[in-house]
């Protein structure tokens, strides 16, 4: 320990430095805890996610009601002002086009003092240094001056007005308004929790990741779709063809080709050479229109080619990993190639739209030399994409399989269980894992695989694929993934995927208490869970187990909204308690600007704090308390740690 305190003394070489830091940390501990925002299953739907981050899921509007007496500010419309705070660039352009020049200037004059007052109100729960870090360098000094003078002596009004007038003269007012709005947006959410699945069927997971990379404080709990992209970057051929197949299925190849710069030309040529469009592989467009009909056919053929490659590679993996106990999923090996049928649970089914041209009936899982070369070329393209690497690096830096934070347990999928509530076990390398140990194993293997991207069929890389579709995967949560059956078998009984018992057991208070204990959390904590859409229109509720379990699948994917009856949930945890937010579908920014698309549906109080929660009561507060103790020890034994 003496070395630790000697190093600490180098950072604080004078006793007065220690006193200053201790007072600063003690003061921070007495501030209200910052607002945490939980969001899950983003599924590439950038505009809807961006809207919620801009608005703080309605928190900005709610705080504005506390900040002003709007009955006295008759000249300003609350909703109109909110839109300026949410979409400042777009709102300014909209007003400029729809107002006269004089009316537009008058409106800008009215907005700036209001924005300054809002910023001051929103920043009151933070230290000055924290607020200063969020201010734009361009206007930092000016904003600090305006913040200092907004509520002071009326005699200084001319000082305030002179600053604004000069900004008008220099044509900088619009830029200032934009910066003020953006700063307010940042301050409304102190910490963001992304509970998995940034990727999936939506078109812009890359834009979401770019947005998240600019966020000051956040963490990510990986989802099953995230892990397949991480697996592709880690060297898994299976994960790679899977993400291409899904992109083709949902008309999102442009993400791979145009925005990640991954060349698919050889795959396109291969797909055209061996496949032709078939009904089972018609892309799902989620209401979007294709500008070129030929593109539909191409996506159809790419989807077929990658599906067959996936089933071949899957059969190979299952052969080399008997411990995965997935031999019943080697369906490409179980096909009767004489009549193109398959027996599933002792029932023979005729295959539909099954192109076996590239399959050796004597060794169905064997890749042709052309396919091997194709996969190698694709892997090089994936692993040398700088933009993809930037995003995957970020997922590894900020992500984990689960997180314990402020007495809450966050994870995406499930904790695999038996129907009696015992943890399901997964035996690997002679050792059995379950519960928390299982998730720790999965995370260590994911990180090991990414550290060795040149290895394509080692255990760590294969476990990433297991996380996508294995029965004991905490990210999948079902007994089998029936992709093969959904493509090739008409009988929908074969398409069924049985959920792990966890998804029924999580309704029970005692089960959730046991889960919290497994992760060393108190019984009054909460579990925040994503992954499964809540079918509220069928009576399902997102608040379970007497408030211990909170299911917050964001419902952003348009394809799920018709089944759920709404657009999902997010969660706010501030110094007053926990609120569950339900959402309506996001339509467009244009409708937001016109005031016709406010997607916050309802807010439900999950838990109200008895006393206002302070920083000292949080995970960060525990760290600060330890720092204070260390500083106090150094202060009292200052001379003992001289070199």
Curated annotation (Swiss-Prot):
GO molecular function: fructose 1,6-bisphosphate 1-phosphatase activity
Keyword Hydrolase attributed: yes
InterPro entries tied to this protein: FBPtase_class3, Metallo-depent_PP-like
Pathway: Carbohydrate biosynthesis; gluconeogenesis
Needed co-factor(s): Mn(2+)
Pfam families per UniProt: FBPase_2 (PF06874)
Enzyme Commission designation: 3.1.3.11
Protein name: Fructose-1,6-bisphosphatase class 3
Keywords, sorted A to Z: Carbohydrate metabolism, Hydrolase, Manganese
């Amino acid at each position: 320990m003496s070395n630790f305190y000697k190093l600490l003394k180098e950072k604080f070489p004078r006793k007065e430095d220690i006193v200053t830091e201790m007072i600063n940390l003690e003061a921070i501990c007495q501030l209200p805890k910052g607002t945490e925002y939980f969001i899950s299953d983003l599924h590439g739907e950038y505009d809807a996610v961006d809207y919620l981050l801009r608005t703080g899921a309605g928190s900005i509007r709610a705080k504005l009601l506390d900040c002003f007496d709007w009955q006295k500010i008759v000249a300003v419309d609350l909703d109109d002002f909110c839109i300026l705070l949410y979409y400042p660039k777009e709102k300014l352009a909209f007003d400029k086009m729809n107002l006269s020049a004089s009316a537009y200037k008058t409106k800008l004059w009215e907005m700036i003092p209001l924005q300054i007052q809002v910023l001051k109100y929103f920043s009151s729960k933070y230290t000055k240094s924290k607020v200063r870090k969020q201010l734009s360098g361009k206007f930092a000094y000016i904003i600090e001056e305006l913040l200092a003078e907004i509520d002071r002596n009326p005699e200084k009004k001319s000082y305030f007005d002179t600053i604004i007038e000069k900004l008008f003269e220099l044509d900088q007012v619009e830029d200032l308004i934009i910066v003020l709005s953006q700063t307010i947006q940042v301050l409304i959410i102190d910490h963001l929790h992304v509970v998995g699945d940034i990727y999936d069927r939506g078109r812009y997971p890359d834009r979401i990741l770019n947005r998240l990379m600019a966020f000051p404080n956040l963490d990510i709990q990986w989802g099953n779709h995230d892990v397949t992209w991480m697996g592709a970057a880690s060297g898994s051929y299976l994960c790679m063809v899977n993400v291409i197949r899904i992109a083709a299925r949902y008309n999102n190849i442009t993400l791979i080709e145009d925005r990640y710069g991954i060349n698919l030309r050889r795959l396109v040529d291969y797909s055209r050479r061996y496949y032709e469009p078939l009904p089972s592989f018609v892309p799902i467009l989620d209401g979007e229109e294709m500008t070129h009909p030929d593109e539909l056919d191409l996506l159809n053929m790419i989807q077929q080619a990658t599906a067959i490659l996936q089933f071949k590679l899957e059969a190979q993996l299952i052969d080399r990993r008997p411990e995965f106990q997935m031999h019943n999923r080697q369906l490409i090996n179980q096909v009767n190639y004489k009549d193109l049928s398959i027996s599933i649970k002792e029932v023979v089914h005729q295959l539909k739209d099954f192109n076996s041209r590239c399959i050796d009936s004597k060794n169905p899982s064997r890749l042709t030399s052309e396919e091997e070369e194709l996969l190698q070329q694709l892997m090089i393209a994936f692993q040398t994409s700088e933009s993809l690497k930037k995003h995957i690096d970020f997922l590894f830096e900020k992500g984990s399989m689960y997180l314990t934070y402020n007495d809450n347990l966050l994870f995406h999928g499930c904790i695999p269980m038996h129907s009696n509530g015992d943890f399901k076990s997964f035996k690997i390398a002679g050792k059995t894992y379950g519960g928390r140990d299982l998730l720790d194993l999965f995370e260590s293997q994911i990180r090991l695989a990414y550290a060795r991207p040149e290895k394509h069929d080692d255990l760590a890389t294969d476990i990433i694929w297991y996380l996508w579709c294995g029965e004991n995967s905490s990210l999948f949560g079902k007994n089998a993934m029936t992709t093969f059956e959904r493509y090739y078998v008409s009988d929908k009984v074969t398409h069924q995927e049985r959920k792990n018992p966890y998804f029924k057991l999580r309704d029970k208070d005692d089960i959730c208490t046991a889960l919290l204990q497994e992760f060393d959390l108190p019984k009054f904590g909460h579990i925040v869970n994503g992954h499964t859409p809540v079918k509220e229109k069928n009576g399902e509720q997102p608040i379970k187990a007497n408030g211990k379990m909170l299911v917050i699948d964001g419902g952003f994917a348009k394809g799920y909204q018709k089944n759920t009856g709404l657009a999902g949930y997010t969660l706010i945890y501030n110094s007053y308690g926990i609120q569950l937010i339900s959402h309506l579908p996001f339509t467009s920014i244009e409708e937001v600007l016109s005031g016709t698309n406010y997607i916050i549906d309802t807010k439900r109080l999950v838990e109200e704090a008895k006393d206002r929660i302070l920083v000292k009561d949080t995970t960060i507060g525990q760290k600060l308390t330890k720092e204070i103790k260390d500083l106090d020890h150094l202060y009292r034994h200052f001379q003992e740690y001289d070199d």
